[in-house]
Each structure stands twice: as C-alpha cells, then as structure tokens.
From Swiss-Prot:
Name of the featured protein: Ribosome-recycling factor
Gene Ontology MF annotations: ribosomal large subunit binding
A biological-process GO annotation: translation
Alphabetic keyword roster: Acetylation, Cytoplasm, Protein biosynthesis
Record PTM N6-acetyllysine, positions in chain: K162
Annotated function: Responsible for the release of ribosomes from messenger RNA at the termination of protein biosynthesis. May increase the efficiency of translation by recycling ribosomes from one round of translation to another.
Gene expressing this chain: frr
Family note: Belongs to the RRF family.
Length: 185
C-alpha cells in the first residue's frame, strides 16, 4: 500500500518536472532550437496540423532555423503560421526552404523572459507540493483506518519529503540553466 502511494507520488512528481522542462524549452533564448517552433500549427487543407508533421526543422547556424517543407505548396501557409505566432519571427522563403532568422533579444526582453521562467518554476514547485500533500493525505487515511502504524506513517512522510526535495532540486537546476541561457549574449 505505502509503496504504491510512494511510486504514484514519484511518477507524478517526475511528470511535473518534465512538464516544466518542456514548458521552458519553448521559451526563446536567442539561440536557435527546433523546439522553438513546436507549438506552431499550420492550416493544412482545412485541418490544423503541427508544423513537425509538415516539415523538418533544423538549425542552420546559431541564429537561424531552416525549415524544409515536404509539400512545397504549403510553404506560404507555413510562413503565415510562423508570422502569426507570438514569437516575433519573420521567415524568409528561399526556394523549397524557409529560413527563420532569430533576432537578438534585448536586455528588457531577457528580463521579462526570466520572470516568466521563474513563474513557471514556481507553478512546477506548487504542483510537486500538491503531489506531496495528496500522498501524505492517503497515508494519513491508512493510519486513521488503522491499516498502518504511526512509525510507517512517519517513515512514509519522510520518503515523500525526500522525493519532493529531489523534484524541487531538479526544477531549480533547470531554472538556473535556463536563466543562464537567457542572460548570455
């Protein structure tokens, strides 16, 4: 019983950490990354389709992404979708390829992005703490029903706290990496 609760808490905390890492990977840092365009959806014959399914996105150099659209007739729609996104990017068409130069970030924009990343980190920490609370509540219910001893309850709470500390440490490490990446020129 307790081991199931612990495993469930561990899995849910890992999901919180991964969701945070995925969320901050979408935040532009001034360095080209194909994941920057992951959230872009293109209208493909009347159906909203993720860009990844319509084209390959590669890094041409540190400030340029290269998009190779599989169906050339979709190039204008892909360009339009990138311009319509809130990323502030202006794609250039060059034959079958689309190049997306990434403008350098201003100091003010870097600070704004840092605040956004810190907010995301706080939400991730809160999610991890909620998982801890849920796990501890389940253990308390077992204690109340006399299914486990007080020693087991205390041991379980300590285990869950260690999991929480580890998950928050991972979040802090990812936050520090992203902040350092944002502040590089």
């Amino acid at each position: 019983m307790i081991s199931d609760i612990r495993k469930d808490a561990e899995v849910r905390m890992d999901k919180c950490v991964e969701a945070f890492k995925t969320q901050i990977s979408k935040i532009r840092t001034g360095r080209a990354s194909p994941s920057l365009l992951d959230g872009i959806v293109v209208e493909y014959y009347g159906t909203p389709t993720p860009l990844r399914q319509l084209a390959s996105v590669t890094v041409e150099d540190s400030r340029t992404l290269k998009i190779n659209v599989f169906d050339r007739s979709m190039s204008p729609a892909v360009e339009k979708a990138i311009m319509a996104s809130d990323l502030g990017l202006n794609p250039n068409s060059a034959g079958s390829d689309i190049r997306v130069p990434l403008p350098p970030l201003t100091e003010e924009r870097r600070k704004d992005l840092t605040k956004i990343v810190r907010g995301e980190a706080e939400q991730a920490r809160v999610a991890v703490r909620n998982v801890r609370r849920d796990a501890n509540d389940k253990v308390k219910a077992l204690l109340k029903d006399k299914e486990i001893s007080e020693d087991d309850d205390r041991r379980s709470q300590d285990d869950v706290q260690k999991l929480t500390d580890a998950a928050i440490k991972k979040i802090e490490a990812a936050l520090a990496d992203k902040e350092a990446e944002l502040m590089q020129f």
